[in-house]
Amino acid sequence: MNVFNDTIVSRVTSEGKSSVGIIRISGKLAFEVSIKVLNRDYLPIRTACYLSFLDLSGKIIDQGIVLWFPGPSSFTGEDVLELQGHGNPIIIDLLITTILSIPGIRLANPGEFSERAFLNGKIDLAQAESISDLINATSEQAARSAMQSLQGLFSIYINNLIKDFTKFRAKIEAQINFSDHEINADNLDVFIEHEINRIISRIKKIRNTAIQGSVLREGIKVVISGAPNSGKSSLLNALSLTNRAIVTNFPGTTRDVIYENIIINGVLFILIDTAGLRITNNPIENIGIERAWNEIKLAEHILFVIDGSRSVQNQLKNYNNFIKSLSKTSCITIVFNKSDLSKFKINSDLRNLNNGVLVSSKTGVGIEALRQHLYFSFKSSFEVNNSEGVVSARRRHINILSMVLEKFLSSKKDWKKINNIELLADDLRTCQDLLGGITGKITSDELLSEIFSEFCIGK
C-alpha cells in the first residue's frame, strides 16, 4: 500500500563520468515524466524501450533505455520509471532539472527508495539494511552473506523465532483462561521447562549466526601484540604488503594504533598494530599501551609476537601473564618472528605451543602460512563453509537478540522460583516485541531515520 503523496527522483549510478547513467523516479507522478520527458502516453510494462529524452521545450537531451514498473509490482511498491542514458554528469543534471520542473516531484533523500520499499511492505527492515551492507561489502564473503539477508534468510530465522514465542504464549494464555481444557497440571511444569529450554537454544543459535554475520560485515579484528621491538610493526607490513608502520631498532617506536585491511580467501581481516606491552614511566608511551589494551579487549584474534633471536623463556613468561590478564577468551597465535637471524633458536616443543607459527617479516618466510592460519582459524571457530547459511547482521540485531536471551533466561529463573504463569506470558510478549524491532514490525521513526540516512543517494 502506497503511503506517500509525493514523487521522488535521483541519479542511482555513482557520481562522475561513466558509460551509463541511470535516473530513477518513484511515486504517483512517475508516468507524468513519461508524458513530459519522453512524449509517450503509453509504455509497455517491464520492457526495455529505446527512446529520446526531451526537455520541456521538446529538444532532445539524450537517448537511451526506458523501463516502466507500475506499482505495486516494483521495488518501492509505487509506480517506478527508470531512464538509462549516457553517464555524462551534465546530461544527468539536465534531465533531473527537467524532471524537477514538474510540480510535485522532488529530489530523493539518501536511502529513500529503500525506505519506501520498507514502508510499503516490499521488504522488511533487516532486508533493507542488507541492501546497504551489499553495496558497502568489502569482501566476497561479506557480499555473499549480505545477499543471503537480502533474499530474506535472516528474516526467516527471526520470524520463525517469533512464531515459537507466539505458539508458546498461546498455549500459556489458553492455560490461564481455560485451565480445565488444556495441559494437565502435572505435565505443565515439564511442558514449560521443555519449551523454555528449546527456545533458549534457538535464540543462542541465531545470535551466534548474527555475530558471525556481523564479523563478516565489519571484518575480523586481528591485534598484533607483544613486547617492544619484537617485530610487530614489521609483521603488519609483511602481512599487508605495505610500509604502513614505521620500523626502527628503538623500543617503543609504535605509540598509536595502526589499522590495515587485508583480504584472505574472500574474507576481510583488520590488522591492528599496537604499542609494545611493558612497564614504563613515559606518559606518551603509556597512552599507547592503554590504547593497545583497549584493542586487545575487542579482538577476534590475537597474534602475540615473540622475538626468536632473544631469550624466549622470559618472553614466554610475559605471554603467560598476558593470557591471565585477558578478560575474554580470544583466539591467540604465538608468532615466532625473525627466523632469518642466526640467533634464532626455537625448538619443536615451542613451535607447537598455541599453534605457533615461525616467520621472518624481513624475508617473507612463513608469512603466507600465517595468512592461511588466520583464515582457517576463523573458518574453524565460526564454522564457515562458503557462506552457506551465513547472513549479514548488525550490532543492533545482536543487541536485540542478547536482550531477548537475557530476558528469557530471567523468565526461566522466575518460573522455577514462583511458577507465575501470567508473568511468564507477559515476558513472552516482551520478547516478541523486541524481536519485532529487527524486522521492523515494531520500530521508531528515529531508528528508521538513522538507518536509511546511512544509505547512498539513489537507494
From Swiss-Prot:
Cofactor(s) the protein requires to work: K(+)
Compartments reported by the entry: Cytoplasm
Binding site for Mg(2+): 233, 254
Sample GO molecular function, one term: GTP binding
Cofactor remark: Binds 1 potassium ion per subunit.
Binding site for (6S)-5-formyl-5,6,7,8-tetrahydrofolate: 24, 82, 122, 459
UniProt subunit comment: Homodimer. Heterotetramer of two MnmE and two MnmG subunits.
Protein name, as recorded: tRNA modification GTPase MnmE
